[in-house]
């Protein structure tokens, strides 16, 4: 367990650093110190994403709005985002651990949890731009694709800088993941 307290100002600074300068952030990121801090980060990112999704549902601007349950759907989206962020933190860390071991990087679970939590800064951004699907499905898909590719760029920097993975292997893995995301998007648009 970590004896330190959570500093919200440091959280905001680190969130900005991850988005603006991921290479620098991940090269100086702490990979130890307990799981409490990354868990708090994940919950905050999930709560912000949930609040935005809730707002879009209240204003009828989200991809899924109204219907039989009305505003209750928005509350469930909020709660679901928070629970999803906690579950996603640990599942994402396990997936990242496997990717890191393939790329000859760190196999320390805590370090992988910390990188995963840092990459979850994308959640509120994705939720914010989720309203684009309300106006135009294709625009929303393209924006979602761009956000996903940027998230993979963050993941690449986390692998190479914080987890000390092999750069070339990490590039190949990220290219494969980008190709999978693009294919899934193309097939999902094609089914409309």
Language-model features, listed with the residues they occupy:
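N-terminal juxtamembrane cytosolic/stromal segments of multi-pass membrane proteins
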Residues: 1-49
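Selective transmembrane helix interface/packing segments
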Residues: 2-9, 13-16, 30, 61, ...
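Generic alpha-helix structural propensity
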Residues: 17, 46, 50, 74-77, ...
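Helix-boundary and loop/linker segments of multi-pass membrane transporters
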Residues: 28-32, 66-71, 164
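Alpha-helical transmembrane segments of integral membrane proteins
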Residues: 36-45, 72, 76, 80-84, ...
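Alpha-helical transmembrane spans of integral membrane proteins, capturing the lipid-embedded, hydrophobic core
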Residues: 42-50, 54, 81-90, 116-120, ...
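Membrane-helix interface segments in multi-pass membrane proteins
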Residues: 52-85, 126-148, 184-192
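Hydrophobic alpha-helical transmembrane segments and adjacent short intramembrane/lumenal linkers
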Residues: 93-180
